[in-house]
Amino acid sequence: MRSSKWLGLILTAVFLLFCGCGGGPTSVITPQPPSALSYTTATAVYIKGTAITPNSPTSTGGAVTSYSVNPALPAGLTLSTSTGVISGTPAAVTATASYTVTASNATGSTTATLTITVNVTPLSADNINLIFVVSEDLAYQDQALGDVSPSTANLTNKGLQRSLLLAPFLQEVLGMNNVTGIYALEPMTHLQTTPTGNYPDMAALETIQQFALLNQISLPTASDGLTQVTANSYPLNASYALTFVPPTPPPEIAPPLLFCEACQGLDFNDQNGDNETLVTGVLGIIAAHVPGFYVFSAPWETTSSLLANISTLEGYNLTLPASYQGPNYIYAISIAPSGSASLVTYNSNLNPPSTYPALPPVPLLSTCAATPFRIPTTGSIPPPPPAQGFIPNTNETVYFMRHAEAHPTSSWDDGNYVGAGQWRALDLPIALSGKISPTQVYSIDPAQVIPAGHSYWSYVRPSLTVEPYVIANNLPLNLFASVEMFALTSPALTNTFFFTGNTFSGQTVLLAWEHEHFPPMVNDLLRSYQYSTQTAPAWPDDDYDTIWTVTLDSVGNLTVDNALCEGINSAMLPATAPQL
């Protein structure tokens, strides 16, 4: 009986324990932690000053009781700690960055990573937008930044980096719309004095080149002039005005043989008020109210004068910057359809590195692709002597280098090179290292006009092809402006300049040029040496890689060959310019 009683008590206690009767322990349901947090928009690009569409979270698992974010969201944006919704109006331009949102409850948490970019407020596509990019020169630059070399008056590695990084920022200013026109300083109108000589101002063209290649233009390409081909390129207008009068030497600028009113650039000295005439007259965009994005690249002296004169001539009475503010500032006169104008100022806040741009590897050639030639041929009879009256230089080497890729089809041309060519141009310092060591570098004056394709263009691509090389090697770039390249006498006059007079005796010269002009130059030189049968071969239109070498030895004997090449595989270059 006693054992049965105790058994009953034990069973009763067990029952009470598990059923919760009598105030004993109860069962507890443990909540789950949240999981799989995500947002409606994981990668967001916002505009400064424009309210965003609220970005809402979703998650699975347990209910979320609080949200937090790290680091803090861009100024003007907030995260609701109770709902996790991101909302607000961005108050400042912010570079692309990652933000981690944490959703929590009492038993755990989960995270999601968002990428947010806040871009500038773009200019209105309904307005006439005159956009001024201030290039640096020796007089107006931030000395602490070191963007301009005091010995070459050219950009430094850091200045080149800034120009490459400025291009996508300028795209944001345009609201990612295509540019309508680009106008740059005519380099020979602004010679800058350095300890080693007076050199043309190429910074304005180089500053805007990457931006030009991020735009596109469609041009006729077939013989009928109707079929359109679109390329990653945009023409840079940097030619002399119709009223331009070449200064007397120095510097000597040949009177232009071809004028292209639509190709006019900016004159540093604003000769005859040509800069204002370009904007208010030649373009005709203000009077006719032609909306678009018109970009001007020039140093502060030219830019500030042009801003002031446009404001005065058009009666805008704008409050303009009183002094140079640095290379990161961009100014825009935005003219509404009503005719009212406002000045919009942008600051890119760029802080580029001081090293040469690091690029992905480009496709290389294992061997030079051109069919070899040499004049005189190996083992031939001794070369003939120079003609009477022709006194050649001695101990001189000149490398003939073609511009970068420029023709997506054979007859397509805009005076510039295309996006693929930027890979070659930027890679030249590496590609040519150990192959050549020039003491001087020359190219065609980009203000000269080339008749190509179905129009006329400023011929900027040879000089811009070699610009990265001279920047990387801290060499000045000389512009050959004293001969009009399309004159019938151009080959003879060019040879006289480079191969006689002893100016280049003992020198090694890199000459960036037009490939169709090299054979006539060599043939004219061969005639000066009384060659009667041997001539230079044609340079193939699809060959951007070969280098011709002209050598004058210690007594002036001539040899010409094409044994060298840059070694870059043109066919494998990306169609779009590299973006850093």
What is each model feature region?
Residues 75-91:
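Strand-loop-strand motifs at the edges of beta-sheets in extracellular beta-sandwich domains
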Residues 124-284, 303, 308-502, 518-580:
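Active-site-proximal alpha-helix that buttresses catalytic centers in soluble enzyme cores
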Residues 49-59:
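A short beta-strand segment in extracellular, disulfide-stabilized domains
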Residues 63-66, 70-79:
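Short, solvent-exposed loop/linker segments at beta-strand-coil boundaries, enriched for Pro/Gly
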Residues 95-99, 507:
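Exposed beta-strand face motif in extracellular beta-rich ectodomains
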Residues 9, 15-38, 115-123:
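Bacterial Sec-dependent N-terminal signal peptides
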Residues 108-114:
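Extracellular and select intracellular beta-sandwich modules with Ser/Thr-enriched
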